Amino acid sequence: MSETSLLPRAHGAAVLSAAMRSTPDDFQVDELPAFEPSGEGEHLLLTVCKRGQNTAYIAKKLAHWAGIAEMGVGYAGLKDRHAVTTQRFSVHLPKRIAPDIAALDDAQMQVIDSTWHNRKLQRGALHGNGFVLTLRQVHGERDAVEERLQAIAARGIPNWFGEQRFGRDGGNVAAALVMFGYVQAADGTLAPAPTSRRRLRNDQRSMLLSAARSALFNRVLTARVEQDSWDSALEGEAWMLDGSRSVFGPEPWSDALAERLACFDIHPSGPLWGAGALRSTDQAAAVEQGALSDPQSEALRQGLEAAGLKQERRALRLRPQGLDYRWLEAQTLQLEFALPPGCYATAVLWELGEVTDAGRFDAGVRSDE
C-alpha cells in the first residue's frame, strides 16, 4: 500500500476524479530562480527546457558536451521525467570557451538562454517552482470543484511529502527498514534482517533516509489533520517562518502570534527526524511522539538517529501562490500555481480528489527522479 494512499483530506471528501499527465505537456514546471546571474565568471549558466527526460540525464548530457566530469555540472533541483520542465544548469568552463550551444538542441531539450556566472549552481538555489497542470476526464460538480479551489487558496493545504519520496507502493520505506536492519512481515511485525544485505551507493542510501524521514513527518501531519490542528496552534508549538527554514518557539500564545499565523507569516511545524531533542514541547510534542510510537516508526526513528541525522523541522501548512484555474473544456481543468522548494504539486491535487497519474514513475531504490 502506498504511503500516501490513505492520507486524510483537510478540506473534506474528494470533489473530483481526473487523469493527469496524459501527455508531458499536461504537466509543466518552470523553475523560479533565486538570483540574477552575474554575467561573469567561469560557469556557463544554461536555462534548459526538457521533455521526457530527468534532470540527471540532462546533466550527464551537458557534461559530455562540455568534455568535463559530471561533478562540474550544477543544478538547483530534480525535475520530473514525465513533464515539460524548465530549469537552470551551470557548466564549469575555466577557459570560458563553450562548445556550440545549438548542438544541444534536440527533441528532448532546448537551450532557451545562456549567460555566465561566478559560481556553480547549488542544490536548493531556487525560489520555488511554477506549475501549469492540465487535468482531463474530470468528473465532479463544477461548483464543488471551484469552491474547493477557493478554500485551498484561502486556507492552504497540509504540506505532505508526495508519493515521489516513497517509491512504488511505499517500497522505499520498506527498503529503509532493511537498511536499518529490519524486515516487516505482512502482519506488520518487525524482525531482524539478514546480515548479508547488499551495500548501497551513497545516492541510494540518501534516498532511503529521505523516504524514512518523510514517512515519519507525514504520520505526524496525519495526526494534526485528523484533529484539525494542522494550521492552528497547540501548546508547545515550534513555529516556522514562511519562505525559510528558520524556526522559533515555543513561546506563550499571543495576539501577535495569532495575527502572524492568520496572514501566513508563520506556520506550525513537524519533525524531520534525527538525533536530539524535539523542538516542540507540551501538547505539540505529545502529538508528535504519539503519532510515532508504533514499532515501525520507532525502528525508522532509531535508524535515522544512528545514521547521524539531526532533528530539523518542516512547516505543516502550505499555501499555493497565485492559484488560478480555467476550464478548457467541460471535463478539462487547467490549474496554475507556484510552490516553495521541497513542496509537492500532488499535495494540491490530493485536496481536490482522486487524480490518476498516467505518467506515474517507477521510483524504487534505483530511481533517479
Curated annotation (Swiss-Prot):
InterPro entries this protein is in?
PsdUridine_synth_cat_dom_sf, PsdUridine_synth_TruD, PsdUridine_synth_TruD_CS, PsdUridine_synth_TruD_insert, TruD_catalytic, TruD_insert_sf, TruD_pseudoU_synthase
Q: Which CDD domains match?
A: PseudoU_synth_EcTruD
Q: Which SUPFAM superfamilies would you find in this protein's record? A: Pseudouridine synthase (SSF55120)
Q: What is its EC number?
A: 5.4.99.27
Coiled-coil zones: none
Query: Which part of the chain is the TRUD domain?
Result: 156-318
The catalytic site is made up of: D80 (nucleophile)
Primary enzyme class: isomerase
- Domain of life the protein comes from: Bacteria
An annotated GO BP:
tRNA pseudouridine synthesis
Q: Identify the Gene3D superfamilies for this entry.
A: TruD, catalytic domain, TruD, insertion domain
What are the UniProt keywords, alphabetically?
A: Isomerase, tRNA processing
GO molecular-function term, one example from the UniProt record: RNA binding
| Function, as annotated | Responsible for synthesis of pseudouridine from uracil-13 in transfer RNAs.
Q: Any idea what this protein is called?
A: tRNA pseudouridine synthase D
